[in-house]
Design a protein with these regions (language model features):
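Extracytoplasmic electron-transfer domains, predominantly the class I c-type cytochrome c fold
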Residues: 2-56
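Solvent-exposed, polar/charged alpha-helical surfaces in well-ordered, non-transmembrane soluble domains
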Residues: 4, 18, 22, 46, ...
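Hydrophobic residues at beta-strand termini and immediately following loops
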Residues: 6, 131, 180
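Sec-exported extracytoplasmic/periplasmic mature domains
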Residues: 25-29, 38, 50-60, 104, ...
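Extracytoplasmic/secreted cell-surface and envelope-processing proteins
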Residues: 32, 121-122, 161-163, 187-189
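Flexible, polar/low-complexity N-terminal or interdomain linker segments that lie immediately upstream
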Residues: 53-110, 119, 200
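Positively charged, proline/Ser/Thr-rich regional signature most characteristic
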Residues: 86-160
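Catalytic cysteine-centered active loop of the rhodanese-like fold, especially the PTP/DSP P-loop
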Residues: 141-187
């Protein structure tokens, strides 16, 4: 999956009308969606934008199978890959573009989704482990490697929940830790890859 569908409820919950219209007019990079700016009139594009927006509440998705929780053996993505070369701001925050590039380059890293588990089931960054912000401190590091592997957390806040988890890990001696600076909503709006439950 290279980008969420325009009718994806998670996408519609956060995408603005202007962003939807832009996607219709100009297409979406690295996807099969073509540009319709020269194929449709401005009125038709406005009508299509309004229709897609209406799917926020009027679209009934097919039943979904919940994504299975990752096993500890699968926590590290690309375990044989190189460590990513991140630029960390304020000793904590990493630009989402660098994380997306690390995934494309098959770098070694761990990604933590610190939102609620229901949000993780709905949509998450590929390979992300659900470690909700309300997890107890004695369980937060369960199964996580404490070596040179980068551990990257994200939330929707865009910092509060992931900051909490990273603080807990740092107290336990985890050094290569960071938070996706822009948060999950901006990850979606950038059309970066997300996955969720499969339709039955």
């Amino acid at each position: 999956v290279t980008a969420p569908a325009l009718a994806n409820p998670a996408y519609l919950a956060f995408a603005t009308d202007a962003y939807i219209k832009y996607a219709i007019e100009n297409g979406r990079e690295d996807t099969k969606m073509q540009a319709f700016k020269n194929a449709l009139s401005p009125e038709q594009i406005d009508n299509l934008t309004a229709y897609i927006r209406s799917l926020t509440s009027g679209w009934s998705p097919e039943p979904r199978e919940l994504s299975p929780y990752p096993e500890p053996k699968d926590y590290v993505l690309n375990p044989e890959g190189k460590n990513p070369d991140f630029t960390i701001k304020q000793d904590r925050y990493v630009p989402m573009a660098q994380v997306e590039k690390a995934l494309k380059d098959k770098n070694k890293l761990v990604i933590l989704d610190t939102r609620t588990t229901s949000e993780w089931h709905n949509a998450h960054i590929p390979g992300a482990i659900p470690i909700p912000y309300y997890i107890s401190e004695d369980k937060v590091a369960s199964g996580l490697p404490n070596d040179d592997t980068w551990i990257i957390a994200y939330c929707s806040c865009p910092h509060a929940a992931s900051d909490k988890i990273i603080n807990m890990l740092r107290k336990k001696g985890y050094k290569n830790t960071a938070v996706i600076d822009e948060g999950f909503f901006n990850w979606i709006n950038a059309s970066y890859p997300i996955i969720g439950g499969k339709t039955k």
